[in-house]
Amino acid sequence: MKEQKWIHEGLITESLPNGMFRIRLDNEDMILGYVSGKIRRSFIRILPGDRVKIEVSRYDSTRGRIIYRLRNKNSKD
């Protein structure tokens, strides 16, 4: 049976080495996130200040996988 995961939204606050990011979730928790393979293959740039969707394991809620970068309302792309 596949493990159930929580999906949260958050804000990238800091960029760390090796594709890791510090993320502040909407519920004010700080977690460590890494970029998923699809985002890495698509060369999607993730920078501090971006809003992202993150998938968090039920067993370790301090780490998560970034699965989607949300569009900024004021950007042209």
UniProtKB/Swiss-Prot annotation:
The keyword Lyase does not apply. InterPro entries: NA-bd_OB-fold, RNA-binding_domain_S1_IF1, S1_domain, TIF_IF1. One of its GO terms (molecular function) is ribosome binding. Residues 1-71 form the S1-like domain. Its main location: plastid. It is found in: Plastid, Chloroplast. Keywords: Chloroplast, Initiation factor, Plastid, Protein biosynthesis, RNA-binding, rRNA-binding. The keyword Ribosomal protein does not apply. NCBIfam families: infA. One of the essential components for the initiation of protein synthesis. Stabilizes the binding of IF-2 and IF-3 on the 30S subunit to which N-formylmethionyl-tRNA(fMet) subsequently binds. Helps modulate mRNA selection, yielding the 30S pre-initiation complex (PIC). Upon addition of the 50S ribosomal subunit IF-1, IF-2 and IF-3 are released leaving the mature 70S translation initiation complex. PANTHER family: TRANSLATION INITIATION FACTOR IF-1, CHLOROPLASTIC. Component of the 30S ribosomal translation pre-initiation complex which assembles on the 30S ribosome in the order IF-2 and IF-3, IF-1 and N-formylmethionyl-tRNA(fMet); mRNA recruitment can occur at any time during PIC assembly. Belongs to the IF-1 family. This is Translation initiation factor IF-1, chloroplastic. It comes from Panax ginseng. The gene is infA.
